[in-house]
Amino acid sequence: MSLPDKAFPVSWDQFHRDARALAWRLAGLDKEFRAIVCITRGGLVPAAIISRELNIRMIDTVCIATRHDYVNQGDTVLLKGVAPELTTDAGEGVLVVDDLTDTGKTALEVREMLPRAHFACVYAKPKGVPTIDTFVTEVSQDTWIYFPWDMGFTYQEPIAKGSRG
């Protein structure tokens, strides 16, 4: 598989720093979160970091599979919903966490379940920004983010193809 023209590889160190930066932003909101709902699978890692930083012990998952070919995003399939006790008060006091909002399709699906929850993600693309309350880094819509859990160590082509450094 060749990399898209705008590839944005993220290391474990960078992701950890960015997830902590998201936790700092959330802490600055002066909101009391009673639980985290992480959107799997991408939300698992930032939820672990944020739950530690904000001392939130109640964590649930909403499992949504997005069919994609690593270039285009497709339909979503709900595999597991949110625990009923977290949907009381329309999700007031619940923090929904994901790694990325791309088109916003997944966030909108979860927002139907938890309309009063606070939605946060580490990275956001322009189409997804309106669906998220708090994020750290915005990238262009045509950028493909490679998360550390999706990568191994391989040779990277230079940005300027054909240059002789």
Swiss-Prot record:
Cite the binding residues for GMP: 102-106, 144-145
Cofactor(s), names only, from the UniProt record: Mg(2+)
Q: Which GO terms describe its biological process?
A: GMP salvage; purine ribonucleoside salvage; XMP salvage
Q: Which NCBIfam families match?
A: PRK09177.1
Q: Where in the cell is it found?
A: Cell inner membrane
Q: Which UniProt keywords apply?
A: Cell inner membrane, Cell membrane, Glycosyltransferase, Magnesium, Membrane, Metal-binding, Purine salvage, Transferase
**Positions with a binding annotation for guanine:** 102, 145
Entry's Gene Ontology molecular function annotations: guanine phosphoribosyltransferase activity; hypoxanthine phosphoribosyltransferase activity; magnesium ion binding; xanthine phosphoribosyltransferase activity
Q: Which SUPFAM superfamilies match?
A: PRTase-like (SSF53271)
Which HAMAP family does this UniProt record tie to the protein? Answer: XGPRT
Organism for this UniProt entry: Agrobacterium fabrum (strain C58 / ATCC 33970)
Q: Which domain of life is it from?
A: Bacteria
Write out the residues that bind xanthine. Answer: 102, 145
Record's bilayer topology term: Peripheral membrane protein
Q: What does this protein do?
A: Purine salvage pathway enzyme that catalyzes the transfer of the ribosyl-5-phosphate group from 5-phospho-alpha-D-ribose 1-diphosphate (PRPP) to the N9 position of the 6-oxopurines guanine and xanthine to form the corresponding ribonucleotides GMP (guanosine 5'-monophosphate) and XMP (xanthosine 5'-monophosphate), with the release of PPi. To a lesser extent, also acts on hypoxanthine.
What PANTHER family does this protein's entry cite? XANTHINE PHOSPHORIBOSYLTRANSFERASE, XANTHINE-GUANINE PHOSPHORIBOSYLTRANSFERASE
The molecule here is called Xanthine-guanine phosphoribosyltransferase
